[in-house]
Amino acid sequence: MNSELSVPAAPARLQQAAAPFLFLLLGTVFATWAARIPAIRDAQQLNAADLGLVLLCGGIGSVLSFPIASFQIGHFGARKATLQSGAALLSILALQAWMPTPVCLMAGMLAMGAAACSFDVAINAIGAELEKAGGRSMMSMLHAWFCVGTFGGALLGSVLAGVQLDVHWHFALVALALALPLWLAFGALPHDAPDAALGKRSFALPHGPLVMLGVIAFCGSIAEGSIGSWSGVFLVDRLHVSDGVAPLGYAAFAAAMLAVRLVGDRLKERFGARAVVATGALLAALGVYGTVAAPTVTLAVIGFALTGAGVATVFPFMFSAAGRYGAASLAGVATMGYSGSLMGPPVIGFVAHHFGMAAGMLLVGTLNLAVAAAAAKAKALD
């Protein structure tokens, strides 16, 4: 990706809003899907293991998407890759609720995982270049807009589930509402040149100082992905809440994550990325353990909020650090992180099926402790 950015002719406000909107779009799609997982599970008559297998397909799709992301950025640049993968993501979301069988749902998740990860890599490549061009930390703020999307999407999902709007209409309306803004954001993004070197590369795991970043990204993102996929099911199955209340756990998680990401860049400048990520991971572990022990819905939701606050800086600081090593390094680390966020939920599903939902959530808390230990030693973060 060319570090010299030229700005296309577009209104100044639209130029400034383009990159934040792309992160908001991704968060909205995630939350829209997550908010209706209980309804889709019931419609397809899936048990915890079956649902875990469906979610595993999303993880597989994310892992397989690296060659797609590399091809797109290498041949078209991150700007065009954003439009291509974003349009695919919205189309797949609209179709997901129409999948007639679990097998079709798995195929849809495979495609959704690939499209979402390709979109994520592209917009973070854009964010890293904007950060580099501006000479200041801004990745946490960009990821805060992802949280705005997840929070808004979760609240909208709660309202629409509460009024019993059909999932088919819910997904279709969200996809349609985001399509035009995606096109406008694409038109306002800074032009970039294709990265020919990245386009010729095959998949390669992070190496050298990036190994620890990849491990932190993988383990840390399991918590974020697992809360998105299982928080509603946890509240329904363990505390017997309604489908309208179920998305509130994820809404609290997203709101707390948003609050921390709004000040994340300042925390990084004052304390350093390693200290912020390590401390946050400890807080996230405390939140998960508190949620499992919570006897009431209110306390469980507070636990989800603490978890969101704790994991808030993992992704933005990981992307920022990897971006300093170039687009190829960012894509490799991002793929490991994205694999964790999408492969974690099915693992939690299998654990929940055999040992109970509480055991699955406890695993998430333990992984956060591992992130805290690893982050304290990851010099590449700073």
List where the protein language model places each region:
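Structural signature of the two symmetry-related core transmembrane helices
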Residues: 80-94, 275-290
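Short amphipathic helix-loop junctions that connect adjacent transmembrane helices
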Residues: 35-49, 229-245
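Symmetry-related core transmembrane helices of the 12-TM Major Facilitator Superfamily/SLC fold
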Residues: 168-187, 359-377
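Helix-to-loop junctions at the C-terminal end of transmembrane segments
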Residues: 65-78, 161, 260-272, 352
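Conserved MFS/SLC helix-loop-helix module at the cytosolic interface between two early adjacent transmembrane helices
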Residues: 64-103
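A late C-terminal transmembrane helix in Major Facilitator Superfamily
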Residues: 325-367
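Cytoplasmic helix-loop-helix junction between adjacent transmembrane helices
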Residues: 108-144
